[in-house]
Amino acid sequence: MISVIKSLLTLSVLSTLAAAKFESATPPIEVVGNKFYYSNNGTQFLLRGIAYQQDTSGSVSNGYDSDPNRKYNDPLADADACKRDVQYFIDTNTNTLRVYGIDPDKDHEECMKIFSDAGIYVIADLSEPTVSVNRINPEWNLDLYERYTKVIDNMQEYSNVLGFFAGNEVTNNRTNTDASPFVKAAVRDMKKYIKDNDYRTIPVGYSSNDDEDTRVAIADYFACGSLDDRADFFGINMYEWCGRSTFATSGYKDRTEDFKNLTIPIFFSEYGCNEVSPRVFQEVGTLYSDQMTDVWSGGIVYMYYEEANHYGLVSLNGDRVSTLADYNNYKSAIKSISPSLARRSTIQSEDSTKTMACPDNSHSTWRASTELPPTPDEEFCDCISQSFNCVVADDVDAEDYSTLFGEVCGYIDCGDISANGNTGEYGGFSFCSDKDRLSYVLNQYYHDQNERADACDFAGSASINDNASASTSCSAAGGRGLQSGRRSSTTRGGSSSSRSSSSSSSSSTGSGSSNAGIKVGGGQMSTVKLITITTIVTAFVGGLSIIFY
C-alpha cells in the first residue's frame, strides 16, 4: 500500500511539472483500456476527425518516399490558414485533425491555440516524406530518432496534442512484415523519451492499411508485449464502405469482430471511400452507433483539401475555400450522430493494463520478430567512430556509399552493421549513421588485411585517420557493446560470423549452402554474405532490389 501511495504521489508531482498549455479548453486525452477518455471528467472521447494537410502524396499510404527534394506543407505553421479553416471544422463538429508532416523547426503555437479554442485536438505523424522507416530496407537509426524526438519536443507542450503516429502503412502486405519491429522500436523509444523528459503522458501509436493477410496480426503485434513496448493505440486506414451499404455487407461487422478483443484503442485513421462520388458518408451513422463504439473510437475522414486523388471536402482557389458536395454530405451525417459514451469509472483496474500475446511469426503471412532493434545511441556511435584508423573519405557523396558497401562487404562479414526484422538479429552498430557504418566496415577490412596501405584506399574513397583514438570499449544503451579500434572479423553478440540465420527471410538457401562461394574482387564470398550485402546495398538505391545471381 505504501509503495502504491508513493507511486501516486510521484505521478501527481510529475503531472504538475508537466502541465500543458490550453488545458482549460482541451484537457489532455488519456488511454484507459481500449478507449480514449477526457482526463478532466472521464467521459469517452470518440474521434470526429479530418485529415488536414495539402499535397500529402509523399507521406500518406506510401510508407517511405525516397525523393530527397520533396517538400511538404506544415499546416500547423500557417496561422492564416488555420484561422481561415477553423470554422469549417467547427461546422462539422470536428474534434481531431490528423497532420502527416510537422516541421519541428517552426512555431505551431498560434494554430494550436486556434484549434484548442475550438475544442480540436491534433494527432501528428512523427515522420515526414523522406525521413521515415523504409518498408523495403527498414532501419531504426539515429536520423529517425532525432527527427521523431524533435517533433515531440516541439509539440509536447500543447494539451490538444492527442497523440503521435510512429508510422503509417510501413508494413502493407505479407512481403514486408519484417519492417514492423523497427516501427515498434520507434514506439517504444518515443514513449520512453516522453517519460524520461518528464513530459505529460502523450500516447504513441501506429496507423496501418487494411490488408487482408496482415490486418489482424499487425494490430495484435503492436498491441502485444509489455506496457513499455506496446503501442498506446492503433489506427487502420479503412476504405471498405463505399456508397450505400450496411454494417453487415460493408465489411464493418467483420472488422469489428476481428478487433473486439484488442486491448488498446482502435479507430479509423483514414476513411471515406470515393468509388461512388459524391461521397454520401452513410457509414458515419454506423461508425458512431452502439454496433461499433464499444470496439472503435471513431475515425478521421480523408481529407480536407481537394487534390488530384479527389478525396477533398473543400477546394482551395488561392486563399478562397469552397465547400464541395462531400463536405455538405459529411456535415449532415456527422451532425446527426448521437453516440452512447462510456465512463472511465466503469473500467476495471485489470482491464486498464491488460495486454495480449504476440502473434505467431512462423506463418507465411506474418514473419515479424518480437525482438526489437536497439535504441539508437549517438554517444555510442561517436565513441566507436573516433577509434577508426580507416574511414570513408569526406569527399565521397552519400549516394556512392552503396558501391563501397557492396565491395567491402564482399570481403568481410558485415553483420555488425545490418539488421533483420524477421530473425530479430540486429548488429550492434546497425543504428549508427550511414557514414559511420561505412567507416566501421572499412576499418574492419583494413585491420583484417594487417593494415596494408592499399587496404585503406578503395580508389581514394577511404583514407587513414591520423586522429584515431586508442582502442577502448564502448557500450550502448541496453548493454550492447562493441570493441573499438582493431578487432577480428568475428561478429559479436546475437550476430554469428556466418549470419546463417539471416538467410531465411530473403532466400531459400539456408545454412546447408552457406559454404557456396562466389569470387568477388579476388575474394571468396559466401551466399549468406551475399544476402547481407543485398540487404545493405538496397538501402541506398531507393528500393531497387539488387540480386547477384
From Swiss-Prot:
It comes from the Eukaryota. GO terms for biological process: fungal-type cell wall (1->3)-beta-D-glucan biosynthetic process; fungal-type cell wall organization. Glycans are attached at residues 41, 173, 261, 467. Residues 484-514 have a biased composition (Low complexity). Coiled coil: none annotated. One of its GO terms (molecular function) is 1,3-beta-glucanosyltransferase activity. InterPro entries: Glucanosyltransferase (IPR004886), Glycoside_hydrolase_SF (IPR017853), X8 (IPR012946). Disulfide bonds join 82-111, 224-358, 242-273, 381-432, 390-456, 409-414. Residues 470-518 are annotated as: Disordered. Residues 1-20 form the signal peptide. It is a lipid-anchor; GPI-anchor. GO terms for cellular component: plasma membrane; side of membrane. It is found in: Cell membrane. Keywords: Cell membrane, Disulfide bond, Glycoprotein, GPI-anchor, Lipoprotein, Membrane, Signal. Belongs to the glycosyl hydrolase 72 family. This is Protein EPD2. It comes from Candida maltosa (Yeast). The gene is EPD2.
